[in-house]
Amino acid sequence: MRIVLITGISGSGKSVALNALEDAGYYCVDNLPPHVLPELARHLANEGQNRLAVAIDARSSASLDEMPGLIRALSREHDVRVLFLNASTQSLIQRFSETRRRHPLSGSPSHDADVGLLVSLEEAIERERDLVAPLAEFGHQIDTSNLRANVLRTWVKRFIEQKNDDLVLMFESFGFKRGVPLDADFMFDVRALPNPYYDHELRPLTGLDQPVVAFLDALPVVHQMLGDIESFLIKWLPHFREDNRSYLTVAIGCTGGQHRSVFLAETLAARLSRQANVIVRHRDAPVAVDASSRLVT
């Protein structure tokens, strides 16, 4: 059975991700107590169901300590994938303010003895980060701070499409002016490269468009940087495999996330596609939703 566990910070988009998986044919359960998961998986398998998605958050805090061992045990019998959603505190505060929802850890002592005294929204967010942090190392992280809901749905679908028999290498382009991604394992700053933005004909285009590709591809300094990043990754990928890493996210950043970072992310994804399962995604580039994330074969 394919089991997708969705966890992370409240307000980061777990409901959006769960809905995307439901649309993809998964049997979905929100806020399932972790200790019930093995029994549910057995029951659904006996019923002929082969895809299950479960959202787990800090409301299950009493059982979160069991999750690492539970994930290992389930992985021996099933294809288990963990998706960890995160977002900046500023983004989360804005989302809770807009929806007027209460954070699950900002309760009063009369309703939640484990939480204690009523805390501010920011304190509740930081407390939840501490509670769910151990789960981040088991899964693929997505920083949803600057993502629209339809883009997140596309990224989730790409996540479940990739094979689970090898390391998944994720290249993510972004713009520094919108903040650095929280999900990056490695981050490369390519702002030192010549910027197509200053060519008025190239300014409205992206690193996916042929004129921008031709501009950057003609520059020796661009190929030097590409070669250095590629050599670094090729050297260290075997060590990450030996460490049983399932996912590795490499973020490539330029000023706006539109030209240079997109071109380098695409080029590196193509070059490394024989070294690992590769996904490339573009956080800030003004591209079509389907082009914002894709498998590289």
UniProtKB/Swiss-Prot annotation:
Q: For binding ATP, which residues are annotated in this chain's numbering?
A: 8-15
One Pfam family, short name please? PapZ_C
The UniProt keyword set, sorted, is:
ATP-binding, GTP-binding, Nucleotide-binding
- Positions binding GTP in this chain are 57-60
Give the GO molecular function terms: ATP binding; GTP binding
Q: What does this protein do?
A: Displays ATPase and GTPase activities.
Q: Which family does it belong to?
A: Belongs to the RapZ-like family.
Q: What is this protein called?
A: Nucleotide-binding protein BTH_I0482
Give the species. Answer: Burkholderia thailandensis (strain ATCC 700388 / DSM 13276 / CCUG 48851 / CIP 106301 / E264)
